[in-house]
Amino acid sequence: MLEQRIQQHFIDSADLKYQAAQTLSHPIAAAVQAVLACVTSGGKVLACGNGPSAAEAQQFAAFCVAGFERERPELAALALTSDNTLLTAAAGSHDATQQFARQVRALGQAGDVLLALTVHGNDPNLLAATEAAHERDMTVVVLAGRPGGKLAAMLRETDVLISVPHDRAARVREVHTLVLHCLSDGVDAQLLGEQEIPL
């Protein structure tokens, strides 16, 4: 019984990824172009999310700076979720919904990209960060579940929404990980050329 339950997780995850491949390839390609335009113009990616999505933000920043699967020059990226002192100071002395927005206002510049990761798209601190990014003329890339919540409604025509067609948080996060891999690989392919990665 337990093994069947475990196997079902694998099946459900694989099914969702297969079904989402065609739907998500276009917005992922648009996100690759947004990140590429940013970093090749001297800009940076600011990534944020809450809970497990915070870890995903840190993972993407690490891929940019330390590399993904191939050697390449470092790309400027920062996870806004990494500085515990700053985050707890903001939570203790200010409106906690502004914890990422303050960093966007301090660090963001026109041409930069804000990468916001969320399951439901209604996180008040991500909404505030998106508003701050728009004030700075930054492009916003959102990874969300279905249908993207309030965050999706805030996006401009130049922003990118990658909305995983599922409601279950675990499935959405599994696809987010794959999307971040596709995004990192796409940037590398555009910078370094197409190349098969050896096993």
Predicted regions span which residues?
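A charged, well-structured terminal subsegment
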Residues: A106, A169-L199
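Glycine-rich, small/polar surface segments that engage phosphate groups of diverse ligands
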Residues: A34-G108
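Short glycine/serine/threonine-rich phosphate/pyrophosphate-binding segments
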Residues: S53-Q58, N122-A129, L151
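Generic N-terminal amphipathic, Lys/Arg-enriched alpha-helix
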Residues: M1-T23
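Surface-exposed amphipathic alpha-helices with a cationic face
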Residues: T130-D137
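Short, glycine/polar-rich helix-capping loops at beta-to-alpha or helix-loop-helix junctions
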Residues: L143-T158
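Short beta->alpha connector loops at strand-helix junctions that form conserved
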Residues: T81, T118, A144, L161-R168
